[in-house]
Amino acid sequence: MTTHEETRAPAAPRNGAAGAGGWPGVAAITASLFVFLTTELMPIGLLTPLGESLDVSVGTVGLMVTAQGVAAGLGVPFIVAWTRRVDRRKLLTALLGVLALGNLITSAAPNYPLILVTRMVMGFASGVFWAIGVSMAMRIVPERHANRAAAVVMSGISIATVVGIPLGTLLESAGSWHTTFLIWAGLSALALLAVAVTVPSLPSANAVPVREVFGLPVRNGSLRVVLVMVVFFVLGHFGAYTFVRPYLEERASASVGFVTVVLIVFGFGGAIGNVLGGRAVTRSLRGGFVEGGLLLIGALVLLLTVGSDEVGVIAAMLLWGIAFGVVQLSQITMTLAAAPETFEAAMSLNTMAYNTCIALGALVGGLFADHTGVTSAVWFGIVLVGLAVLLRSVTGRTTASAS
């Protein structure tokens, strides 16, 4: 069984650059990532008002993240394989159509069960986007700019956390959560139009049948290790991050305005982390992940110790964002490096693990929040991220060898 350890993601199979070097299409795909991610994580900034409006607990509202994550995770390997003959531009526009309609339904939904079902349907679309989006961007620019295109698309994560989620919180405070989701339905429709106009026709890249997708971790030891690390990391991070708002409201008596500031600070930290992560993974994939993970643990410990000190909270959230940016880029690069010849299938498995664990992290964090207090959700994050770092530390030296 052959394993791989590389410091760069492999170049994607090409279909020729689009007009203007393909960069308008890259921008459209980045905008798509923005609306997909903000839609998925929007409830994190709206837990309290959603719970009050729908008359459910904070932990129950957290299931909105859980439902979308479960659907995204469990459905993506099958949908990517089943649509391997579908033009990727057509597929992406269809996914954005589902997202726009889902946000529209959510904005007008009269009850929580309808919202939950709608989130699950949107989750299927979100999962497929994560599996195909980056590779699409890499293929529509000249080959020498492929890695740069991937980095631009991934910057959508930072944009979403800096602007999107805090903006959703701000819009809710100025109006209502209904208005927030209605606006996001419009943004999803605009992203759909941008993709339709700027992204060229693209066949699937290295897609394989379903049975081969699930056989990849069996045959590829490096990919198997990376996927387990993703499980631990995402469980820990989102188990804690999903409940940032109620944690700050309980421990620091935080206002909506301060929570918004904190989320923006976290997003800026993520942007810094993306830059630092790019340098770290070029030097060492293992080192980048371990360093980012240790910094994240330190940030969570700091958050627990500063109490109601607003400066301390901001510092902790900035460090948390930086760490998240480093680890996020590291785990994606490790996935692509572990399976360069089947990267679309490998990314579908990564997406399955990642989104399922967003869901499980929110679920377990919600159980802790409801039964033992929101502080325990932060401790849960520390333990699980620690397991991810430990696994990477003890396996990183052996993944380059053949077994």
Feature-to-residue mapping (PLM):
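Juxtamembrane intracellular "pre-TM" segments in multi-pass secondary transporters
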Residues: 10-21, 198-227
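Helix-breaking motifs and short loop linkers at transmembrane-helix boundaries and internal kinks
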Residues: 55, 87, 108-114, 253, ...
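Conserved MFS/SLC helix-loop-helix module at the cytosolic interface between two early adjacent transmembrane helices
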Residues: 74-113
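Helix-to-loop junctions at the C-terminal end of transmembrane segments
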Residues: 75-88, 273-285, 369
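Paired small-residue
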Residues: 102, 113-122, 311-319
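Helix-loop-helix hairpin linking two adjacent transmembrane segments in secondary transporters
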Residues: 112-114, 142-199
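Cytoplasmic helix-loop-helix junction between adjacent transmembrane helices
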Residues: 118-157
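C-terminal transmembrane helical hairpin of 12-TM major facilitator-type secondary transporters
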Residues: 287-331
